[in-house]
């Protein structure tokens, strides 16, 4: 009957991935705030680079060295972060940041920073240990369930996890320098979004394809 047909239709498995077609907008949102939230994004796989477990180490390096020192310590922002995932999506973000153009210049400078990356073996080991500590942090049952669901929905296998872990543990400074190509591929897309003060966005409106006011 019709009800049975409807029930059966509702149980059909999805035959393929859901594809969202996005376009670059490079938006600037003007607010009454005196600080900015500044993001640069891009897909490094689309740019010809590949994902590697060493990118998880890079997140730690940027958080405690390059982005932290330049955006937080010298630039006066409240914080900064980065991320790089298996499908090639990456971002660099600052928040409660008094700067805009200067922060964009710092993002562009990350490629040269990586090309010339040189630290002591002790510091390199600290970055690796910090990365593994993030991966192996204790989880309660709820967190374990959420992680398992996330891995399942993103089709991440045990083999992929083991490979990534080996890439992290075996990484050296040369591997980090190779990541300059990944960041270069990500940044050449030149996708950005800023929420910030009207003054800063108007001063740098040439950066944006669209400028809007948030009320």
Regions found by a protein language model. Name each.
Residues 35-57, 63-173, 188-196:
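M16 family metallopeptidases and their MPP-like homologs
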Residues 170-215:
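In a subset of proteins, long, contiguous C-terminal domains/tails are tracked
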